[in-house]
């Protein structure tokens, strides 16, 4: 091989390596702690038949899970000298499945860079909204109960969800009254209301949640692109309700980004993580010096 060809091959290899690094999807550096939500034979509501499985790949590097018959969460702890905030992350998937890496573990990895513990929720799917709602209620109670064990600040436990997971997170943040399942153990003595909520292109908000927004609703950040024609109107209505009730809120509304991008967008919506970080700092979840 000539010297010119060697140089060309070296440059090509370098370019390919750089492209590979750029396209690599972030994942938490350390394996997480897996916690089942319910004791054996104590799960309330309707069970999901079948065994958890991964849906066929679609060529978009998204791991889609379904048939979640044993709901759980995985804790990805932040490295922090002081107790850290924690966020329960609910992936979307239309309540039919979970975009587990794109809207779950990749988000937990980003939260870790902010000094936040990410808790990725596997809630009951498919077609089990009430079971999923019971799952997120149980999850926030377990996180608060075991906060000292995981070095979490119990006063800074929030929720974050995408698409259907955004609906699930919003539903918890507007919920008043007791849990929708009977007390099982001491974890169920913990509060239900999140300290804050982050909703990424949330779905179904205009299907009954908007009238439930009141002065007790969790402080809420919404990120949504206008070209998500199916669901943007729900976010608009939810934002108006937050504003009317003087609930602390922020709405990053941009022109392009569509639906289902997670942290991967190259459109206008790609700056939403920075906007969210700034808002979390503003409301005191993150330290202002970060």
Go through the PLM ranges and name each one.
Residues 83-92:
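Short beta-strand element of the alpha/beta-hydrolase
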Residues 229-236:
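Conserved alpha/beta-hydrolase "acid-adjacent" motif
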Residues 134-216:
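Primarily recognizes the serine-hydrolase "nucleophile elbow" in alpha/beta-hydrolase
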Residues 99-101, 106, 120-153, 264-271:
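Catalytic nucleophile-loop/oxyanion-hole region of alpha/beta-hydrolase
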Residues 216, 222-224:
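Short beta-strand/loop motif that positions the catalytic acidic residue
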Residues 239, 243-290:
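C-terminal catalytic histidine-bearing segment of alpha/beta-hydrolase fold enzymes
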Residues 24-81:
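N-terminal cap/lid segment of alpha/beta-hydrolase-fold proteins
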Residues 91-96, 226:
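Active-site glycine-rich loops that stabilize anionic/oxyanionic intermediates
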